[in-house]
């Protein structure tokens, strides 16, 4: 009698692996703005003609969060930061809205303080006037992608960011926030088939997974689109404790990342690691996440190395656990052991991490999403953010590193 062999099954369909140059068909480089479109808007663009925020996205039952994030590192003065536009649609549209997250921090400090953050603020964005595939505009905030006719050393597109938060509309720590910058975007990439990792409702065999048909897709996903190198020009100004601060960005290197989560954060992943290194000659980025036990505790790692105008190397792995913590420190408040040194793929190491911020991940999200997640058991969501001068290969620059622990 033949013995039936039980086939191994999975409920998680990760992106493809890129382990060597022979895997070049497993990722796609791009130099067109179609990959930069708002995913939550684009997937329903044909259905809805209106630019109305509440009509632009249909009502799935799942929660969906999309972020467009610009990380920049000014190598001349060590000022670093991020500007993030966050869109969320919760539980089929019970809540929909935009939020702006803004952070500035330093790569070094003369003070003997472990935490040294310049500013961190979040703003709810009201009065959306335009929500199109490449543009979001409100009374106070504009994010707008503009294609360049001829791809060149200037890149294939520009991201225009304008922010004007009036005095008195925020906390007493930050006032009069004004941003007017132009970002020239160089070559981007996604990991195939479509940049998405899918969380399946039903288990499928590994043979079915390899086919990559409709059985291995879902509205529940994590999707990433990367532009690992570009340059910012413009100004950022604000008042901190009523003292004016102004940053003049001139060809400041940056990383752009579009991320979509089709699940609430504690369902999507149990932990994350992130690297953005920018030097005079090249950039290195990496993102790694581990799914929850329900989806096999699977670890997906994606990385890329770029020079000033093109991508030199792309990699991705599944369950290689490429990010390592050689040394850690326990946070007495929550029990998490966050890194004091860290290593990433491609030989990037930082042995002296400099903590600039520590906060609850839910504090970046709208209050409605936060209230849902905080009511669930085993939730201790903290992000540890580091910024320091670093070296990569023969280049010197600044690295922004994040380690996130959720449950």
Swiss-Prot record:
This protein's UniProt keywords: Cytoplasm, Isopeptide bond, Ubl conjugation
Protein name as annotated: Uncharacterized SVF1-like protein YLR225C
Additional information: Present with 3990 molecules/cell in log phase SD medium.
Protein family (similarity comment): Belongs to the SVF1 family.
Matching Pfam families: Svf1, Svf1_C
Compartmental location: Cytoplasm
Any one GO CC term of the record: cytoplasm
Record-linked PANTHER family: CERAMIDE-BINDING PROTEIN SVF1-RELATED, SVF1-LIKE PROTEIN YDR222W-RELATED
Domain of life where this protein originates: Eukaryota
Gene Ontology biological process: response to oxidative stress
Cross-link Glycyl lysine isopeptide (Lys-Gly) (interchain with G-Cter in ubiquitin) placement: 22
InterPro entries: Ceramide-binding_SVF1, Svf1-like_C, Svf1-like_N
Keyword Transport: no
Lineage: Eukaryota, Fungi, Dikarya, Ascomycota, Saccharomycotina
């Amino acid at each position: 009698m033949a013995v039936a062999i039980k086939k191994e099954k999975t409920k998680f369909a990760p992106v493809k692996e890129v382990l060597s140059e022979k895997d070049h068909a497993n990722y796609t480089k791009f130099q067109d703005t179609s990959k930069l479109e708002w995913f939550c808007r684009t997937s329903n663009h044909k259905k809805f003609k209106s630019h109305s925020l509440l009509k632009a996205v249909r009502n799935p039952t799942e929660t969906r969060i999309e972020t467009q994030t610009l990380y920049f590192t000014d190598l001349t003065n060590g000022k670093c930061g991020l500007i993030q536009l966050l869109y969320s649609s919760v539980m089929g549209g019970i809540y929909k809205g935009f939020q702006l997250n803004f952070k500035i921090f330093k790569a070094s400090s003369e003070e003997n303080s472990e935490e040294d953050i310049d500013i961190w603020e979040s703003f709810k964005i009201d009065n959306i006037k335009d929500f199109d595939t490449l543009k979001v505009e409100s009374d106070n905030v504009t994010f707008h992608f503009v294609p360049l006719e001829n791809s060149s050393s200037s890149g294939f597109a520009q991201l225009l960011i304008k922010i004007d938060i009036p005095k008195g509309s925020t906390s007493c720590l930050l006032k009069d926030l004004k941003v007017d910058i132009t970002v020239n975007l160089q070559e981007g990439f996604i990991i195939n088939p479509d940049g998405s990792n899918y969380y399946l409702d039903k288990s499928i065999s590994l043979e079915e997974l390899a086919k990559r048909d409709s059985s291995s897709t879902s509205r529940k996903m994590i999707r990433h689109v990367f532009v690992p190198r570009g340059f910012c020009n413009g100004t950022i100004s604000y008042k901190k404790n009523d003292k004016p601060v102004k940053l003049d960005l001139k060809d400041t290197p940056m990383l752009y990342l579009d991320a979509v989560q089709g699940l609430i954060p504690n369902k999507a992943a149990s932990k994350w690691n992130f690297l953005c290194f920018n030097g005079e000659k090249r950039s290195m980025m990496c993102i790694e996440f581990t799914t929850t036990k329900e989806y096999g505790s699977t670890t997906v790692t994606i990385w890329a190395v770029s020079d000033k105008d093109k991508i030199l190397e792309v990699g991705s792995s599944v369950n290689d656990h490429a990010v390592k913590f050689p040394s850690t420190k326990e946070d007495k408040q929550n029990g998490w052991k966050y890194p004091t040194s860290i290593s990433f793929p491609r030989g990037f190491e930082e042995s002296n991490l400099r903590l600039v911020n520590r906060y609850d991940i839910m504090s970046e999200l709208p209050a409605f999403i936060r209230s849902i997640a905080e009511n669930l058991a085993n939730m201790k969501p903290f992000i540890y953010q580091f910024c320091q001068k670093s070296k990569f290969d023969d280049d010197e620059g600044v690295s922004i590193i994040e380690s996130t622990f959720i449950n």
